[in-house]
Amino acid sequence: KLFCYWGRTPKAFEARGCRVFFAGQNSSDTVEANAAVVARRIDEIIALTGAEKVNIIAHSKGGLEARYAISKLGKGKFVASLTTLSTPHHGSKTVDLLRFVPDFLVRLCCKCCDIGFWVMGDKKPDTYGSISIFRTAAAAELNRQVIDDPAVYYQSYAFIMKRPTSDMLMCPHNIFVKLIEGDNDGL
């Protein structure tokens, strides 16, 4: 791993007295597989700290995985809150449109994403294999199956990149997605 995906955020929380843990799932595994990783990590953190509950902050697909762990894997009793950041809870119209793009181009773009995920620490990134969950129909089905636990506090935030050049890694995504879906965080 060449750098921390979360940037300076963990240190900011730790400076305020919070203990920070990472689930360690791969970005491109299925929601179900990564939810199992999240569920195991919740158990480990509870055992390690003696805490009754954890607060989860999840980004992008990680929000779907945390919701699945809470709802389908019974971890709601150990979660006080789930905060999702730029999670595609309703899917992406951009991903829906990929069916009109030649497959070799989609695969090429996915391979470029895989390189970025590998640099961030993923062992075997497979963006092409994991993008189906971002289709709006797949997200709607997931939302039908994954019911919020009434004992968990949920909140969700989305962000807007001011200008595409704010993050050169996200620049191409930002421009493309903005044409289809409007302002976005680059993903």
Summary of predicted features, one role per range:
Residues 72-187:
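Helical cap/lid subdomain of alpha/beta-hydrolase-fold lipid enzymes
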